[in-house]
Structure formats: C-alpha cells, structure tokens
Amino acid sequence: MTTTEGLLMIPRLLLGGMLSLSLFVTGCSALRVSTSEQNSKPVEVGLRDSAQATPEPTEKAIPDGMEEVAVTLGEECPISVEFAIDRRWGDGVGYSGYWLYSNGDARLISVNCYAWGGTQPQDVTDEAMDVTFSESGSRVVSEKVGETPGGVFWTVQGVLGPSEVRSIASTESVLYGAVAGIRDDGRLYKVSVEMVAKSDDAEAAAVYAQMLPTVRFAGNALTPPPGLN
C-alpha cells in the first residue's frame, strides 16, 4: 500500500466511530472511455468537459434552506474550503486535515486536505480520475477539468459500484465531488469534497446537485460538471 492509499484509508477506518460520535452529539465536451490497459477496471463512458480555455467560474448563490460553511482543517491544510450545506447534515466531526458531515449513516460528506508528495497539481487530479471510479459498476456521469489559481481541479458526478471503498454499505452509490491540486507557499496540497449517498436516495442526490456548484477552494469558485448549475 502506498503512502497516499494509506492516507485515504484512514478516514474509512475511523468512519464508524466518527458517525457514532456525530449521532450522539446531534441526536453526517468529450467522451471519457477507460479500456483494457487495466483489465480489472470497467469501461467508463461519461460526459467530460475539458476545454483548454477554462472560463472564469462564477460564485453560486446559496440555495434556499442551506447555509455556507467554512471548514477548518487545522495545521494539515492551509487551503480554505467553503460550500453550501443543508442544515440536516449537522456541524460535522473530524480532525486535522479531515472533516465529516452526516445525515444518518448513509448520507455522508467528507472534506480532505493534506500535503501531496508529487510535484505537479495535475498529478493530483489525474490520480483521482484514475482511482475514484475504478471498480466494476462504477461510471462517470459528468465531469469538468479546469484550472484554479495555484492549481488544477476536477469536479464530477458519478456512480460508485458496490465494491468501491467510498460506496455506502457496499451498495451502488452516487458521488458528487470536487478534487484539486493546489500550491500554497511552495507546497502542493490535495484538497477534496466528496458527497456520497445510496443510488436510490433521490432526495440526497438532489441536495448534492445543489451543493457541488457552491464549492470553493482557497476562496475560488470551481466550475461544476456539465448539467449542474
């Protein structure tokens, strides 16, 4: 297991305990096709917008019934993270570099940030694109790749197969996410927001579709995937 994989598994291992704490306190355009170089990966077909000239993203208004949160990630991460959140997801729990919001045990929003060992911001998003939807039954529905001050971002809407590490209770799940590689004071960081729910939870998916376009990293808005406003 690589260092990066180990870091990514830490939140998963602590998830059960953190959910219990949260419940106690509160009462959490081109086709992209991946083929046969890695036989274990499924064929993925989705709408992708990766034009060279990225229009300046515009900040989205906070949807009705939501409020903007500024996630404090401690010493692990100097990159600010803000987005609108439905109040039903509570105040969240976490530790330096990681924060988790939940609405029950099957509607999760995780925020991650840590120093990245590579050298190029694009390496961060390239790896995320390779591994996030890598198991059978997973697919990208819509995605956007672009530049942000100090780095590169990837926003995505997709479906996670039951065997994906991010899936809910080993069932097919939806994911709405934003990942970026951003330099700060000469150091490269990976920062992400991932919103996950079971694929039959249409209500949560509709909420996530409103939240994702409001995500900002380091104070900068990100362009959402095609189809999300």
Label for each model-derived stretch:
Residues 2-100, 196-229:
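N-terminal targeting sequences that direct proteins away from the cytosol to non-cytosolic compartments
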Residues 72-78, 94, 125-136, 149-150, ...:
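Low-complexity segments enriched in small/polar residues
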Residues 84-88, 102-106, 149, 182-188:
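Short, solvent-exposed coil/turn segments at beta-strand boundaries
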Residues 98-104, 154-156:
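Generic recognition of long tandem-repeat/solenoid scaffolds
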Residues 101-127:
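A short acidic-to-branched-hydrophobic micro-motif
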Residues 133-184, 226-227:
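Signature of long, low-cysteine stretches enriched in small and polar/charged residues
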Residues 186-197:
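Short, well-ordered beta-strand elements
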